[in-house]
């Protein structure tokens, strides 16, 4: 009997899926880049709106400048914008920009009237919904989710806790790290396992 050779196994490239937010997301992107991994970023918005929102401007002028692709006058806001732009240039982006026009109007209105709680709620609901969608895409493409979380709210749509719960619900294991105690880590495989994690 004639034997046929088994096909050679090929390793697929290691990818980091991240939303590129300021902080842990960008630290992870830096480490992944050093290891030669591909960086994939499902952004909750188109690139310009993503930079403008996630740089967290406090003034209308800074928000509008960033939205137009310019610079913010606040150094902290500009530093966050630079970080997001830097990693966006190095990542393969999937931009969820279909609601950008609507959300940009809400973003501008919130910055123009920061004391208006109704406008703020509308903006945060729309932005949170987009962040949740980007998080869902990220989780669905991941073999393991690494969550750096203080075990705070799970109710904030699109937030870290929400994304961790979503991953566990669809069967993606989560390596959970507590920022105040990095030596305290657990690998979780179900939402029930969150109850005992503290």
PLM feature spans:
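Acidic/glycine-enriched connector segments
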Residues: 1-197
């Amino acid at each position: 009997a004639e034997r046929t050779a088994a096909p050679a196994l090929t390793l697929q490239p290691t990818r980091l899926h991240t939303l590129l937010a300021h902080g842990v997301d960008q630290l992870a992107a830096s480490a992944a880049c050093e290891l030669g991994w591909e960086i994939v970023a499902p952004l909750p918005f188109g690139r310009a709106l993503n930079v403008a929102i996630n740089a967290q401007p406090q003034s209308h002028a800074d928000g509008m400048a960033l939205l137009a692709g310019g610079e913010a006058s606040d150094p902290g806001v500009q530093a966050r914008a630079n970080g997001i732009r830097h990693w966006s240039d190095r990542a393969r982006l999937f931009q969820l920009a279909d609601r950008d026009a609507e959300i940009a109007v809400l973003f501008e209105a919130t910055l123009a009237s920061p004391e208006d709680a109704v406008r703020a709620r509308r903006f945060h609901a729309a932005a949170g919904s987009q962040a949740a969608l980007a998080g869902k895409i990220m989780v669905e493409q991941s073999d393991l989710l690494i969550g750096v979380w203080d075990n705070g709210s799970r109710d904030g749509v699109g937030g870290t806790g929400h994304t961790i719960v979503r991953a566990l619900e669809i069967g993606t294991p989560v390596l959970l790290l507590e920022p105040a105690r990095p030596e305290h880590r657990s690998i979780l495989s179900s939402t029930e396992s969150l109850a005992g994690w503290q």
